[in-house]
A protein has these predicted regions:
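Surface-exposed beta-strand/loop patches in extracellular or lumenal glycoproteins
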Residues: 49-67, 156-162, 448, 493-514
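Aromatic/His-enriched, Gly/Pro-containing loop or helix-boundary segments
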Residues: 60, 79-97, 133, 137-140, ...
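Beta-strand-rich binding/interaction modules
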Residues: 69-76, 462-463, 475-556
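Extended, low-hydrophobicity, Ser/Thr/Pro/Gly-biased non-transmembrane segments
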Residues: 107-225, 394, 584-593
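Long, ordered, helix-rich scaffold segments
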Residues: 487-492, 503-506, 521-525, 542-879
Length: 879
């Protein structure tokens, strides 16, 4: 990654100097097909014309380009020597005129890491598929540009592609001619027929949201129509794309249903017509992210096309992502942050709007439960790491930006906005959004621009709110204090607010406090509720004085604010015995989340949390909450349980999961969820034999359909425990000879309990760049099996020896995958903590982004050790 960075100061200096009028980009991707020549990276031709102005004639600047070679550069008609002006990442531009035209002819490399123009060869049929992914700064891998969000411009794309391909971009395109000419690119040499696709000019947009998708994609079309109050009609062509091999699984009608519901919702609430013409959505292979909001051409990871039976939680997650990306058309694409400091201006809003519209426009009316249970768990974890930061972050450069697509920017920011809606009111919030769009359309903004419109519409001082919620880090804890009078009623109920020592800010919270009692039939139901503004260290909720004594007090009932919920002794005792009796699903989700935070904070023994899951998860009606409980229970056992209790706890989890699997309604999504969890927990010989029997048909559980995806889920534990060998996995790949099948097989192969297997997997990921991003991810996932701690122990020193080299030599995406994924978290001992500290002490000059990843992993390890100590103490006292 050397030489590829761009600092905020450099970007500000360039933005003050230049303004861009237009881009014309011509790509020739006919070289994507054909055999590799083996002579260097496979490349494509990229010719870019940029027209721009300079307000200081005679000044110097630079354009961005990451390419193996540059053929020609001309500036204002003057030919420049590429060897003199191009250094591998920048093109020097000297003696600029007031009006300038830059033309760059380059050979750019196809990507195998999901950064830039990614090339994928489908193992099922040999077809080649291309797509681009840029955020935050990888469009410079495809064409020369000024790679920063505040130098917006209209774009015209022209693409030469193989004759039988279709090409898509941000604008409407058409095939205008056939061509047959020599290909100068490396990779697919000779002459090749093709078609030229030309696309309509875009509105002014940032470089990182331009997009090209090309290949023999399967396409389904539809349309959306809207008539506004003034009689104007808006028609939006809709498209949905996937690989041909996935067409039989593609439920495009559901994608279009959610898309139309979202467009209706946002038009109703934003009062600004969708501004980018068409709306295509491509589900693409080997995608690093969930999705990307390229205007008119949204890209998604193809795992959102389901090859087998999934739960409604998966459909809800897909709908949420569709709506999240759609919200970006306004928050992020129409109005864009000036620099990555204000990334939250788009991501927090899109995350909030995804759930807001999900609940308001689709069949997934319990979306706020998922938000409280899953999204906020991500935020709470991120906000307690040493790398936590304010929602408005200090982003010094592009490496900082890459790492700040995190739980703070997304989920905490969205939680803060949910709190803001409670603070200023929904009407004022949405009116502020409408003014924001109209005032800053096709422009760039900072935090102050948003605060200005919210002050106008709410009449409140947003400065103080922003200082507390957007410009400080950390999460507060809220705990109820209940004093009962002689008559057994509440004499005083107060909410106590605490902050971490490192971030002592006490914030204003709008909260609901709920009181719950057990009914005669054992249900735990709310009988009183009061909303109040919490400020300072202690706030008395006077409205609840005189109420009957509660069995449970739930601060932040209805999930209005962002905080860690704590319990008084009575409430915690009630939950230990009666959590399953909570009738309200959101209240249950909030209590489960709070109990998980207590476990992570070493305030609740891991064995107690596992016990609660075993006792009450079978009664959980919300499938998304149930699947989250499964993940938390596994994490509690693997990371937070005392080592001496792991075997006992693991056996209990497997037995409990199997019992629930057998009791679940045949064919239900709960049965499917318990089947997957049982596979995760299985380790005893009898459990592994059952999985094997379910695969070969000698065992059967009524209603459980063991489809291909479930087969792979069963095969991984069989491989990890030495039951499924290479021959078995090869036979399964022959049965499922697809891109998905290959990823599953690679993961299972790396999971096998052999020193030679681990050495081979390590070499493929750490010492070689032969694998694509998706196969790197699969190999890492298979490598680290919780049942193989001793086998993996030798890789602790090798990890610390390798990571700086990997970070320097590989792309930032692969570097992040390796540094995060191979950290020796399973070697959870003080010695590993010391080794981590030793590396940090010896590498104070390492890249800040790399140090951040190691510091985060260290914090997770230290937290795990504290949790294990808490759990061990509980075991000792119980003994």
């Amino acid at each position: 990654m050397p030489g590829e960075n761009l600092s905020r100061d450099e970007a500000r200096e360039r933005a003050a100097l230049l303004s861009v009028d237009a881009y014309e980009v011509s790509l020739d991707v006919r070289s994507a097909v054909g055999e590799d020549t083996g002579d260097g990276p496979r490349t494509f031709r990229s010719v870019t014309t940029i027209r721009f102005r300079c307000n200081e004639p005679g000044a110097s600047s630079f354009a961005d380009l990451l390419a193996p070679s540059v053929t020609a550069v001309s500036l204002n008609g003057r030919d420049l020597d590429p060897s003199e002006v191009f250094d591998g990442s920048r093109i020097l531009l000297e003696d600029l005129a007031a009006d300038n035209e830059l033309v760059v002819d380059a050979q750019c490399a196809y990507s195998r890491t999901g950064e830039g123009l990614h090339r994928f060869v489908d193992p099922e049929d040999g077809e080649v598929y291309l797509y681009t992914q840029y955020e935050p700064a990888d469009s410079r891998r495809v064409f020369a540009n000024f790679e920063q969000p505040d130098l917006k411009a209209p774009f015209r794309f022209e693409v030469r592609a193989p004759e039988d391909w279709t090409v898509w971009s941000n604008g409407v395109g058409e095939r205008i001619e056939k061509v047959r000419e020599a290909l100068p690119q490396k990779g697919g040499g000779g002459r090749r027929a093709g078609g030229v696709w030309r696309f309509a000019e875009t509105k002014p947009i940032s470089t990182y949201i331009t997009c090209v998708v090309a290949g023999p994609y399967h396409q389904v079309t539809d349309s959306y129509e809207r008539v506004f109050e003034d009689g104007t009609r808006l028609e939006i062509p809709l498209g949905a794309l996937c690989r041909k091999g996935l067409a039989k699984h593609f439920d495009a009608e559901d994608v279009f249903l959610v898309t139309k519901q979202g467009l209706d919702f946002f038009h109703d609430h934003f009062d600004y017509p969708y501004p980018f013409g068409k709306y295509d959505q491509a589900f693409v292979p080997e995608y690093n992210l969930g999705a990307m909001e390229n205007p008119g051409m949204v890209t998604f990871r193809e795992e959102y096309i389901f090859r087998g039976k999934v739960t409604q939680a998966s459909y809800e997650a897909r709908a949420n992502v569709i709506l999240h990306e759609m919200a970006h058309m306004w928050f992020g694409d129409l109005v864009t942050m000036e620099w990555w400091d204000d990334l939250w201006l788009k991501e927090s809003f899109a995350d909030f709007m995804g759930s807001f519209s999900l609940v308001g426009a689709t069949r997934f009316t319990d979306g706020w439960i998922t938000f409280a249970n899953r999204r906020k768990a991500w935020a709470y974890r991120a906000d307690q790491l040493p790398s936590t930061h304010p929602v408005t972050a200090d982003i010094r450069d592009l490496q900082d930006a890459k790492l700040n697509f995190d739980g703070i920017t997304y989920a905490k920011g969205a939680s803060v906005l949910k709190q803001l809606v409670a603070y200023v009111g929904q009407d004022a919030f949405l009116e502020g959004a409408r003014r924001y769009f109209k005032r800053h359309a096709y422009g760039n903004t900072r935090l102050g621009d948003l605060l200005a419109v919210l002050e106008e519409t709410s009449g409140r001082d947003m400065g103080a709110w922003a200082r507390s919620w957007l410009q400080t880090a950390g999460v507060n804890s809220l705990t109820p204090q209940v004093v009962l009078g002689a008559d057994g009623r509440i004499e005083e109920l107060a909410v106590v607010q605490e902050a971490a020592e490192s971030y002592p800010e006490l914030r204003p919270h709008r909260v609901a406090v709920g009181l719950y009692q057990r009914s005669q039939v054992g249900a735990l139901e709310r009988y009183a509720r009061a909303e109040t503004d919490v400020a300072g260290a202690r706030t008395v909720v006077s409205e609840l004085a005189g109420a009957d004594a509660p069995d449970l007090v739930l601060v932040n009932d209805d999930d209005l604010t962002y905080c860690k919920i704590r319990f008084d002794e009575t409430s915690l005792a009630t939950l230990r015995e009666h959590l399953g009796g909570l009738t309200d699903p959101l209240a249950r989700a909030l209590c489960w989340s709070a109990l998980w935070n207590l476990t992570r904070d070493a305030l609740l023994p891991a064995r107690d949390f596992v016990g609660l899951v075993l006792r009450f998860a079978g009664r959980e009606s919300d499938i998304g909450v149930l699947q989250m409980l499964h993940a938390w229970a596994e994490s509690a056992l693997v990371h937070y349980a005392a080592p001496q209790w792991r075997e006992t706890g693991g056996r209990a989890l497997a037995e409990g999961a199997l019992a629930e699997l057998r009791q679940a309604e045949p064919g239900s999504e709960h049965q499917l969820a318990w089947a997957r969890f049982f596979a995760t927990a299985a380790s005893a010989p009898d459990d592994l034999e059952l999985l094997k029997g379910l695969l070969d048909g000698t065992e059967e559980i009524a209603g459980l359909e063991v489809d291909q995806e479930l087969r792979w889920a069963f095969l991984e534990p069989l491989a990890a425990h030495g039951v499924a060998d290479e021959k078995v996995l090869a036979a399964e790949l022959a049965r499922d000879d697809t891109a998905s099948g290959k990823r599953h097989q690679v993961r299972c192969l790396a999971a096998r309990p052999s020193a030679a297997v681990k050495a081979g997997a390590w070499e493929q990921v750490v010492d070689s760049d032969a694998l694509s991003n998706a196969l790197v991810e699969a190999t890492i996932a298979g490598f680290g099996q919780a049942s193989q701690r001793e086998l993996l122990a030798p890789y602790t020193p090798r990890y610390f020896e390798a990571i700086e080299r990997v970070w320097t030599e590989r792309s930032i995406q692969i570097g992040m995958d390796v540094v995060r994924g191979l950290f020796p978290a399973l070697q959870d001992s003080p010695e590993t903590l010391e080794a981590t500290d030793a590396w940090l002490a010896a590498h104070e000059g390492a890249a800040p982004a790399l140090r951040r990843l190691v510091l985060e992993a260290r914090d997770d390890l230290a937290r795990a050790l504290r949790g294990q100590a808490c759990d061990a103490a509980a075991g000792t006292s119980a003994g």
